[in-house]
Amino acid sequence: MHDIAGVTNETGNVLGMMPHPERAVEALLGGTDGLGVFQSLINQTEGADVRGAR
């Protein structure tokens, strides 16, 4: 319906998605288009205080 591939909550800190970016992170396997998803996760969590996080 409407070609929706993913959804987030209002604050953007919860993501649900149908594509599999982990399958597109190695050029040897056909492409690196999925790297952006994982790089953004790294960028957002670097320096974050995760003590006590569960």
UniProtKB/Swiss-Prot annotation:
Catalytic activity: N(2)-formyl-N(1)-(5-phospho-beta-D-ribosyl)glycinamide + L-glutamine + ATP + H2O = 2-formamido-N(1)-(5-O-phospho-beta-D-ribosyl)acetamidine + L-glutamate + ADP + phosphate + H(+); L-glutamine + H2O = L-glutamate + NH4(+)
Keywords: ATP-binding, Cytoplasm, Glutamine amidotransferase, Hydrolase, Ligase, Nucleotide-binding, Purine biosynthesis
Catalytic residues (positions): H20, E22
Keyword Cytoplasm among record annotations: yes
Name of the protein this chain belongs to: Phosphoribosylformylglycinamidine synthase subunit PurQ
Residue ranges occupied by any Glutamine amidotransferase type-1 domain in the UniProt entry: 1-51
The enzyme's E.C. designation: 6.3.5.3, 3.5.1.2
Function: Part of the phosphoribosylformylglycinamidine synthase complex involved in the purines biosynthetic pathway. Catalyzes the ATP-dependent conversion of formylglycinamide ribonucleotide (FGAR) and glutamine to yield formylglycinamidine ribonucleotide (FGAM) and glutamate. The FGAM synthase complex is composed of three subunits. PurQ produces an ammonia molecule by converting glutamine to glutamate. PurL transfers the ammonia molecule to FGAR to form FGAM in an ATP-dependent manner.
Gene designation: purQ
Functional pathway: Purine metabolism; IMP biosynthesis via de novo pathway; 5-amino-1-(5-phospho-D-ribosyl)imidazole from N(2)-formyl-N(1)-(5-phospho-D-ribosyl)glycinamide: step 1/2
InterPro entries reported in the protein's UniProt record: Class_I_gatase-like, PRibForGlyAmidine_synth_PurQ
One annotated GO biological process: 'de novo' IMP biosynthetic process
PANTHER family: PHOSPHORIBOSYLFORMYLGLYCINAMIDINE SYNTHASE SUBUNIT PURQ (PTHR47552:SF1)
Record's subunit section: Part of the FGAM synthase complex composed of 1 PurL, 1 PurQ and 2 PurS subunits.
